Amino acid sequence: MSTNSVTTAVEKADHQVSDVTLRNRLLDALTVSSGAVDTVSFIALGKVFSAFMTGNIAFLGMAIASTTGSTTYGVVPPRVISVLAAMAGFAGGIYLATKIVRRFEQSAANKNQQPTGVVWPRQTTLALSISLLAHLCFVLIWFATSARPGGSVIPVLLATWALAMGMQSAAVRQLDVPGIFTTAATATFIFLFGDWAYNRPLTSEEHSRLRGVLVSLAIGATAGGLLLIHAPIYAPVLPFVITIGVVVTAARAFRYDDEAQESRGNVPLAA
């Protein structure tokens, strides 16, 4: 093997490692965003999540049970309409983003432009870009109500933000990174502790990735809570700005043209 070939192989490997590291940091950022979203949703929008659908299903059951005329241990559950609005918005976001991704993939395949080994595909950035419209709508409505939305507006806000979170979840799913969804930590716990039970040692990259998600979710939740306390009008701006940053960074950092694919070796990369 020539010296040039060795140098090229090393450069390709460096590109791949660098791309994976950047991808993980972008996933951390999206997790911070969803942590802030759920904190603001739960506190300010009637104890309903915009991203964590497992919690909403439990809340829906509580709300239905409360229709019998009593509360569970004195806890007042959220309104059924609010929970259903969030669930419908999230489902709609997943459906919309998945349709966008599939159409993009089919179009690329028809043109024989579907790259392989891409750490962050273009369709993920596209879906996240469109989710910004839902974020923007939420921010505008929030500003219009001076951070104090009424009962009739809350379901609209929940559906809007859940739409954005559903699109984010579907976009991240395209990356096929084990244990990472950015909108909940349940899968991360399953992946982490399940592998420990099987005595399969995690790599340093896996440790960093999983730890980053858990820490980022806590950071986002804390930041969202602090904003609600000290500057409630700007609380939804944080996830909006973070998502913009992720979209811009991904669009600039990951190239998808043939020349870029050739420079990266066009080699499939394990998550």
Which residues does each PLM region occupy?
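Alpha-helical transmembrane segments of multi-pass membrane proteins
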Residues: 2-271
